[in-house]
């Protein structure tokens, strides 16, 4: 990877935006970080650079919310997210970068539309649904592995449960901490070895 002016114009702002978003100040601006980095590097390399930042920030966040989470919800969504991650790791090389971005974009649009069209009264919490939790968390694991963008399907399942704010935030943090740790060996699996890199040259 060549480090030049384009690298600093695209990668450095992308990492800064990701840091701001993880601090809670930037909302969903982190969604543009990975696409911005792919201007100058392959997608899997961009994912590998972002992942340690995610894990480091997770450590701090988990410590803060270590007593505020819904264990019952996590028991459902973490295993299915792991399944989605494994599927993503085995199919990752078969998708082009543009196709992956398109898939995640379409999923985000559909999930957002579903939430706003079918949401119930804010005072009525939805019941935990095994099938919905399994589907949403599996897709969250897949999209999180492919482009670090699993927030939308996760929110689609968690928000209707109307948890207390601290419990919702803590559950979400613990969930993505587990997801990021599971992604680490899977991302190493999909990364080209030094021998492959030399042969590619």
Describe these PLM feature segments.
Residues 1-23, 32-44, 67-142, 159-161, ...:
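Juxtamembrane transmembrane-helix boundary motif
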Residues 24-33, 146-155:
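Transmembrane helix boundary and interhelical junction motifs in multipass membrane proteins
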Residues 39, 58-62, 85, 112, ...:
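Hydrophobic transmembrane alpha-helices of multi-pass small-molecule transporters
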Residues 43-64, 177-178:
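Transmembrane alpha-helices of multi-pass small-molecule transport proteins
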Residues 167-187:
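Hydrophobic alpha-helical transmembrane segments of multi-pass integral membrane proteins
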Residues 189-196:
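Conserved small/polar residues in nucleotide/adenosyl-binding loops
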């Amino acid at each position: 990877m060549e480090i030049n002016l384009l690298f600093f114009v695209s990668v450095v702002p992308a990492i800064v935006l990701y840091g701001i978003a993880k601090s809670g100040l930037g909302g969903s601006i982190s969604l543009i970080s990975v696409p911005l980095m792919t201007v100058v590097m392959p997608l899997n390399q961009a994912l590998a650079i972002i992942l340690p930042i995610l894990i480091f920030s997770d450590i701090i966040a988990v410590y803060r919310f270590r007593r505020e989470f819904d264990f019952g919800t996590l028991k459902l969504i973490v295993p299915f997210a792991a399944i989605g991650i494994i599927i993503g790791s085995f199919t990752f090389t078969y998708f082009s970068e543009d196709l992956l971005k398109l898939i995640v974009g379409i999923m985000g649009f559909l999930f957002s539309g579903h939430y706003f069209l079918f949401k119930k009264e804010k005072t009525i919490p939805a019941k935990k649904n095994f099938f919905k939790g399994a589907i949403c968390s599996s897709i969250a694991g897949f999209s999180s592995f492919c482009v670090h963008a699993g927030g939308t399907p996760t929110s689609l399942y968690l928000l209707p449960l109307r948890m207390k704010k601290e419990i919702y935030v803590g559950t979400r943090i613990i969930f993505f901490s587990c997801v990021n740790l599971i992604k680490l060996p899977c991302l190493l699996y999909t990364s080209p070895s030094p021998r492959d890199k030399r042969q590619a040259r």
